[in-house]
């Protein structure tokens, strides 16, 4: 009997969760983006269950975890250079965010490197329908990547994950989170997007000087 050699998975974060940050609201006692943080936790748990990702590596990276006082731009560039799949949470705030546009462009540069090397297989982008959106409300480039799935619950497309969670449809929302984790893991294996030198993004970050207060205030 031949020896079985298990196939090792890439030991990098599977998802970079790109989202339009909500501002603090004096009318609410809940932290902004609390539902998104919960979704990220559920998605991370499923990705750990579906893969052999080692402890100590974030399954899904969220920029809320950048330590206060750190060189946050360097942290963000490093994550954008290493995470395997971009996971944009589609919403009006994401579409109007300069930082989310930068995060998309960083992943596109990594993909272009693989195109130039002749090793590009497919996009390493898995959008999440976060807010309830009509197709005509989703602008390019987000509209150019598949964001709906025939085998997902029909109410996902009608309400988005935000609507499902807000209406107490937790069983449906958690099922969608599991299916999205499956999709992200599959895309990571298929795309095999290679890490790059974070310096590839220096000019993009330099162009954002003076914009830190928009969303990134670490």
Predicted segment positions?
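Short mixed-charge
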Residues: 45-59, 109-123
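C-terminal interaction surface of TIR/SEFIR-family domains
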Residues: 1-48, 72, 79, 120-218
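Homeobox/homeodomain signature
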Residues: 56, 84-85, 118, 137
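TIR-domain catalytic/interaction hotspot
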Residues: 2-7, 61-116, 174
């Amino acid at each position: 009997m031949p020896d079985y050699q298990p196939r090792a998975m890439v030991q990098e974060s599977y998802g970079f969760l790109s989202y339009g940050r909500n501002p603090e609201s004096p009318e609410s006692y809940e932290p902004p983006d609390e539902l998104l943080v919960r979704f990220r936790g559920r998605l991370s748990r499923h990705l750990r269950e579906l893969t052999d990702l080692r402890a100590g590596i974030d399954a899904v990276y969220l920029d809320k975890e950048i330590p206060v006082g750190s060189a946050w731009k360097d942290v963000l560039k490093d994550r954008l250079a290493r995470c395997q799949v971009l996971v944009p949470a589609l919403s009006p705030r994401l579409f109007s965010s300069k930082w989310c546009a930068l995060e998309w462009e960083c992943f596109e540069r990594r993909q272009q490197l693989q195109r130039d090397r002749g090793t590009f297989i497919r996009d390493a982008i898995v959008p999440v329908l976060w807010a309830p959106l009509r197709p005509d409300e989703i602008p390019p480039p987000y509209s150019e990547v598949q964001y709906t799935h025939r085998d997902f619950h029909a109410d996902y497309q009608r309400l988005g994950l935000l609507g499902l969670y807000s209406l107490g449809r937790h069983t449906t929302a958690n099922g969608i989170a599991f299916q999205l984790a499956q999709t992200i893991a599959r895309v990571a294996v298929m795309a095999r997007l290679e890490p790059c030198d974070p310096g590839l993004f220096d000019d993009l970050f330099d162009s954002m000087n003076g914009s830190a207060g928009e969303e990134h205030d670490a």
